[in-house]
Amino acid sequence: MTFAKTGFDKAEFKKNVISNCKTLYRKNFEEADKQQQFQAVAYAVKDIIIDKWIATQKEYAKQDAKTVYYMSMEFLMGRALGNNMINLTVYDEIKEVLDELGVDINVIEDQEPDAALGNGGLGRLAACFLDSLATLEYPAYGCGIRYKYGMFKQEIRDGYQVEVPDNWLKDGNPFEIKRSEYATVVKFGGYVRSYRDEKTGRDMFVQEDYRAVTAIPYDVPVVGYGVNTVNSLRIWDAEPVDTFNLSLFDKGDYQKAVEEENLAKNIVEVLYPNDNHYAGKELRLKQQYFFVSASVQRAVAQYKERHDDVRKLYEKVTFQLNDTHPTVAVAELMRILMDEEGLEWDEAW
């Protein structure tokens, strides 16, 4: 897939950086602190990406291209600003603009925290796959969790290592876009009630007495190197279906009033929670099912926006499972195809 390449306008970029600083912080660029300057630069780089991102999705839709959904518990993406400037092939030009503004590009890059979405080789492998897929211009989504703290960061206190939360989102992520229109409900627990459909004669299954959370996707651009293709890393945040129980709060049951909110928050707090106890094992399984269910539901819904026959899903959608964590996707896809789309077992399989 080939797109027409566009030039880089240094004067326009400089203007956008200065304007971003005023809009975001009510400050002139030279008056802003380093973190604020980073945000202003990052949003200006994002502006370059956006048109390519939109054009990529339009081209994929036009070609009705088969899409791969790469599911992984972690993505070790690194810092986005420098990587995006390099892949857009505008690093040197932006360095010149920042020199004119009196700031060192390396200092600006250092203001960005590492995205706490991955930890080791598994996450780095996933990130490399996404980079390669975008550079080779294959239609692809990365699918994972938008962890609030990731794992931890290390501090040395009195000569000892201390693990503290890595609050990487405290200043926001300038490259992500919240996609509330694609919010998806994920159900946990309860029981399955079966009944026979009088019209079709089929046995039907309904999940009841479950607890639900709302999965909210955030899209992060994955810029291909030297091309105009921009794919997406879609990471899911968890929010309660019912945010706040005012009735319980008014009765003084404050903990119960926010119980559903805490249930949702726990799912996305950290990568690989301690599973030396039952609660930790349960939380890990919830995390795995949470992002897998949301991703598969969205993939099927996106397919149905352009196609009527769900039996031909395999022609346009493929799922790549990174390690064992997302393998519950097999069972979840079968559930969706059978219980929601009405296929028989052999058809779904």
Task: Provide a role label for each language-model segment.
Residues M1-W349:
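A conserved ligand/cofactor-binding region detector
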